[in-house]
């Protein structure tokens, strides 16, 4: 009753239907840290220190048959996006690379504004 067939799912963490014991719990393993993450962190650290991180970046890429790349911060961030998808690292990566509050609306990216809820404006006409 708790497993639904509708909607999109990421294959990386597919539900193990055979592992249900009480109809609610699944026995899927989740990834905490991976060697590819360690290699990408090392590559990033080397690049930030003025060294070459090409070897570490390309070890990750070679595993999936991708061509070699020069380790730049932009290439490392893109590789982290592809390699660590759905593992919960993207927000931290964007903050660390100073791209989280990127200007997307033509306004300064240093402030976040939230709209006033419609219900609050209806209750208080002074809110505009």
Predicted segment positions?
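Intrinsically disordered, low-complexity segments enriched in polar/charged small residues
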Residues: 14-17, 39, 66, 85
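A generic alpha-helix propensity feature with a strong bias for hydrophobic helices
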Residues: 4, 36, 118-120
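Extended, hydrophobic/aromatic-rich amphipathic alpha-helical segments that build helical scaffolds
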Residues: 29-59, 74-85
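Long, intrinsically disordered, low-complexity segments
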Residues: 25, 30, 61, 68-128
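A broad, low-specificity signal marking well-ordered, structured residues that form hydrophobic/aromatic
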Residues: 8-11, 57, 74, 92
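Short, glycine- and charge-enriched coil/turn segments that flank and shape catalytic ligand pockets
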Residues: 51, 66-69
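Flexible, polar/acidic helix-loop-strand segments at domain edges
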Residues: 1-34
């Amino acid at each position: 009753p708790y497993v639904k067939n509708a909607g999109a799912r990421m294959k990386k963490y597919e539900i193990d239907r055979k592992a249900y014991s009480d109809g609610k719990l699944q026995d899927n393993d989740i990834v905490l840290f991976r060697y590819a993450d360690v290699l990408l962190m090392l590559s990033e650290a080397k690049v930030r220190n003025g060294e070459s991180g090409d070897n570490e970046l390309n070890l990750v890429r070679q595993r999936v048959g991708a061509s070699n790349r020069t380790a730049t911060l932009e290439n490392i961030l893109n590789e982290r996006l592809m390699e660590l998808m759905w593992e919960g690292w993207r927000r931290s990566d964007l903050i660390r690379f100073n791209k989280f509050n990127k200007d997307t609306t033509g306004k300064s990216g240093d402030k976040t504004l939230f709209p006033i809820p419609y219900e609050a404006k209806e209750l208080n006409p002074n809110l505009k």
